[in-house]
Amino acid sequence: MYLTAHSGSDQTPENSLAFANFFKDKKGIDVIEVDVRCNPQGELVLSHDALEKKEYVRLSELLLILEGTTIKLNCDLKEANLEQKVYQLAQKNNQWSQIYLSGNVSLNYLKNWPEQLLINLENFVGRQGRSPMWDEDDACEKLEWLGQQGARVINLSHLFYTERLARKGNELELSFSLWTVDDLADIRRYQDQGIFNVTTRRAMEYLNQQEVFR
């Protein structure tokens, strides 16, 4: 199982260079996640929310910190049409192999980067009326459809990850990436189940707990 440190994990500043510096060489942390947008100057910057008139950390700065490391970076795209920008930036320093893309990702890129796209299932599934929960029948149908499009890894909230969905994914030979799992027992349970990736805000806390139990 990959363990991804959610932006701001373990009380580090969200979408910051301090966050990247803290986790870049931590054994057991496979991936760090940041939120990516494009500013009016055409630069990729880190922010979960819509941009305001202030300075943001540039993705290029964060990539410099990760240069020469083995850790991977999940760029959670908060806007559409950023895939090529991230690719071109990462390619400049031969870092594309370190990158995953999730969030607003076009399925058109599956033919080029099937192993590096974490496809967010919720982008395609309808809701049950006004309920915050989705239609599970539709979710299973969309799971099959995404598999037909070439998806390899399905990204979704662990709250929506049911036994039925797990069985369907297994039938389709799809892997799952679950977010944001902050119960340490749940992380361990998913690890034991062989989940492809778990994203958490308690990454180091989880690793430290597992070390104590050894």
Residue ranges and their predicted role:
Residues M1-R214:
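Phosphate-group recognition and catalysis centered on beta-loop-alpha active-site segments
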